[in-house]
């Protein structure tokens, strides 16, 4: 008996990052973590900056960083559209740490003309990238 799978396409503003059959997708939706498996009900939702974890047809896993975007689930296909998509090994950990530090400093020293939304987005994206890096480190240590 063949494993149940669904076609997944992960697309950034620049290119298609992943296209293939998967058994499971996990992303951070606007209302919390969301798991998508074959047969999932149709859905269209926003996704927050965070990790996308896929379990491929052969059981192997791959992890991506998404800057946020849109998730569309159809009966036989799933599409993830994001401005920025990085494979876990493409994330610059030091740059993410520095971006997190900058955003935290900006939030702490906010003035009257401060753009809170931009700083909060930068902080969320940096934290999400660091979580992806940490997840990969934990999986390698196993």
Swiss-Prot record:
It is found in: Cell inner membrane. CDD domains: F1-ATPase_delta. It is a peripheral membrane protein. SUPFAM superfamilies: Epsilon subunit of F1F0-ATP synthase C-terminal domain, Epsilon subunit of F1F0-ATP synthase N-terminal domain. One of its GO terms (molecular function) is ATP binding. GO terms for cellular component: plasma membrane; proton-transporting ATP synthase complex. Keywords: ATP synthesis, Cell inner membrane, Cell membrane, CF(1), Hydrogen ion transport, Ion transport, Membrane, Transport. HAMAP family: ATP_synth_epsil_bac. F-type ATPases have 2 components, CF(1) - the catalytic core - and CF(0) - the membrane proton channel. CF(1) has five subunits: alpha(3), beta(3), gamma(1), delta(1), epsilon(1). CF(0) has three main subunits: a, b and c. Belongs to the ATPase epsilon chain family. Produces ATP from ADP in the presence of a proton gradient across the membrane. This is ATP synthase epsilon chain. It comes from Shewanella sediminis (strain HAW-EB3). The gene is atpC.
